[in-house]
């Protein structure tokens, strides 16, 4: 029986996908066996960033160069990523969590169910308060929606209460959370969600989760 959980992390360029994974791994790597697979079209920039900045050793981080549409590599033809998962499991048979970061994408990104057991979609306040109500599969179907960079709301004229209202309407009961990853605000809520809904720990919902 498979003992590890694959967590897909998607979202637009610059929303904070890599930052989220970097902060998460810093907090949980001492508690769980973790590995990361990143996707970039022509480079391994995200993998290199994580290698330099996360607490994970380099052999636990693998970069996949998709060479084309990032949608395809996580959905229609996930073979490169599935091979990367197999290689990571061969390296670390005890692995418990594998984060798979998609290439920067739009609001329609979704993971193949063969590739991700649960999905996190990251958007950010700097894109404007209208982003949640634009919908798209990433916002409406992901298991957890992360709305990052709350500290920028005053500078871009975004009303967080409007974003909360719209996200609640679009998500139809599915959880979402506001974060400021620069200061680790509500990072504990994301960790709590992973423990409860990915690792199936018998714990309460984090207080920072919104439904």
Swiss-Prot record:
The keyword Secreted does not apply. The keyword Calcium does not apply. Keywords: Chaperone, Cytoplasm, GTP-binding, Nickel insertion, Nucleotide-binding. One of its GO terms (cellular component) is cytoplasm. It is found in: Cytoplasm. InterPro entries: CobW/HypB/UreG_nucleotide-bd, P-loop_NTPase, UreG. One of its GO terms (biological process) is urea catabolic process. GO terms for molecular function: GTP binding; GTPase activity; nickel cation binding. It holds the Pfam family cobW. Facilitates the functional incorporation of the urease nickel metallocenter. This process requires GTP hydrolysis, probably effectuated by UreG. Homodimer. UreD, UreF and UreG form a complex that acts as a GTP-hydrolysis-dependent molecular chaperone, activating the urease apoprotein by helping to assemble the nickel containing metallocenter of UreC. The UreE protein probably delivers the nickel. Belongs to the SIMIBI class G3E GTPase family. UreG subfamily. NCBIfam families: ureG (TIGR00101). HAMAP family: UreG. This is Urease accessory protein UreG.
